[in-house]
UniProtKB/Swiss-Prot annotation:
Stored SUPFAM superfamilies: RNase A-like (SSF54076)
Protein name: Ribonuclease pancreatic
Stored SMART domains: RNAse_Pc
Reactions listed under catalytic activity: an [RNA] containing cytidine + H2O = an [RNA]-3'-cytidine-3'-phosphate + a 5'-hydroxy-ribonucleotide-3'-[RNA]; an [RNA] containing uridine + H2O = an [RNA]-3'-uridine-3'-phosphate + a 5'-hydroxy-ribonucleotide-3'-[RNA]
One cellular-component annotation, GO: extracellular region
Gene3D superfamilies named in the record: Ribonuclease A-like domain
Organism name: Notamacropus rufogriseus
Compartment annotation: Secreted
Amino acid sequence: ETAAEKFQRQHMDTEHSTASSSNYCNLMMKAREMTSDRCKPVNTFIHEPKSVVDAVCXQENVTCKNGQTNCYKSNSRLSITNCRQTGASXYPNCQYETSNLQKQIIVACEGQYVPVHFDAYV
């Protein structure tokens, strides 16, 4: 799995325009293999066409959380869902809180149009 493929698996959900129910994160985190060996504590899904997310790589250049300079912030707010593990849940029964948001996203890119890491939303 390449970094770009991993980004697609962990962060892209183009089929849904928003999280359909409060159970969305529980289902999606499992379906996208983020609970197979541990519970990934936090993850964000983006409900926009791939072309829209790829285009962020040519928008505002910002510094990533880790200090690298290959992060880019979207010009507009995008439809995203944030999944956060609930305090009471433990592997293998990972449980998540689902939050629907409209936020600008920050992604790290390789080359001109290849998002490889979700850094933050603002």
